[in-house]
């Protein structure tokens, strides 16, 4: 049995990322074989946004990056898709802070790759 849409999770870089992993990492036109989601932390700051954002054009496999927000990742799974939501906290120092969705991606059943929704 071969998995057609594996998903990997990370989080030690304290920022949000969505990345499609290609069969040939040096060829962005090669087949997408998996998706990687990275979640930020609620309390720790992330890498400098401008420094990373300025080189994203050199990394076409990166579909989304943001290190300016604090929050967490929420995932809903059904037979049709896996829906990933990047949730952000309005103020990490306020116990009554609100939570909102920064970005959403779906990975469809049987198909590799993240699709913004």
Regions found by a protein language model. Give the residues of each.
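Long, structured stretches of catalytic cores involved in phosphate-ester chemistry, encompassing
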Residues: 1-117
């Amino acid at each position: 049995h071969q998995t057609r849409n594996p998903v990997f999770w990370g989080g030690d870089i304290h920022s949000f990322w969505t990345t499609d992993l290609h069969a040939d990492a040096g060829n962005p036109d090669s087949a997408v074989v998996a998706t990687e989601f990275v979640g930020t932390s609620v309390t720790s700051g992330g890498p400098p946004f401008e420094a990373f954002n300025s080189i994203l054009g050199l990394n076409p496999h990166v579909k989304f990056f943001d290190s300016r927000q604090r929050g967490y990742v929420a995932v809903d799974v059904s037979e049709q898709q896996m829906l990933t939501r990047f949730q952000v906290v309005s103020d990490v120092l306020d116990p009554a802070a609100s939570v909102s969705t920064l970005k959403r991606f779906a990975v469809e059943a049987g198909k590799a790759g993240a699709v913004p929704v």
